[in-house]
């Protein structure tokens, strides 16, 4: 089981976080990550690889995007990056600070950039955005990812969500928007 999980992780890392920065960097892989569970580690970091296996941290291993400037909870986890059909880079991440509890992730952070350094961002806090609805009862939004839907000609974000429901088992599902 452990080998299967590790294989899945490596395949996902290679295929979902690979982007080509500029023409002179074609053939390199960019890995976008956070480094730990402390608030100071839940920030966006980059690593680069020429073979997709051995990655070297960029920026001295320091964050390239400070979470306290983009996230409601002042921490981000599970970043996912995609190079858009228009040449822009799109990144989504869980808006969460693990030190505030494992159910402190009530939203997502969406970002876009033309150069991987200067990012525009927008947060969606489900408790605020959907106040008074069932969606406001969310207490676990996990690992958002972005895909391009060629039929609809737009980007979709999908994520898992755990919400408060009556009964013994809370509702867990995968959603997209």
Regions from the language model: what does each represent?
Residues 7-16:
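Bacterial N-terminal signal peptides
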């Amino acid at each position: 089981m452990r080998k299967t999980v590790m294989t899945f992780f490596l395949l996902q890392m290679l295929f979902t976080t690979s982007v080509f920065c500029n023409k002179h960097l074609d053939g390199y892989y960019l890995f976008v990550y956070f480094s730990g569970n402390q608030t100071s580690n839940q920030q966006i970091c980059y690593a680069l690889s020429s073979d997709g296996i051995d990655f070297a941290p960029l920026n001295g291993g320091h964050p390239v995007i400070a979470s306290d400037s983009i996230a409601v909870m002042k921490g981000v986890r599970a970043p996912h990056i995609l190079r858009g059909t228009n040449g822009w880079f799109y990144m989504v991440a869980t808006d969460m600070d693990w030190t505030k509890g494992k159910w402190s992730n009530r939203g997502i952070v969406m970002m876009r950039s033309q150069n991987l350094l200067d990012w525009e961002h927008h947060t969606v806090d489900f408790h605020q955005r959907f106040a008074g609805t069932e969606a406001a009862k969310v207490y676990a939004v996990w690992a958002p990812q972005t895909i391009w839907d060629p039929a609809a000609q737009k980007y979709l974000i999908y994520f898992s969500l755990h919400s408060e429901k009556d009964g013994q088992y809370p509702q867990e599902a995968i959603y997209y928007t």
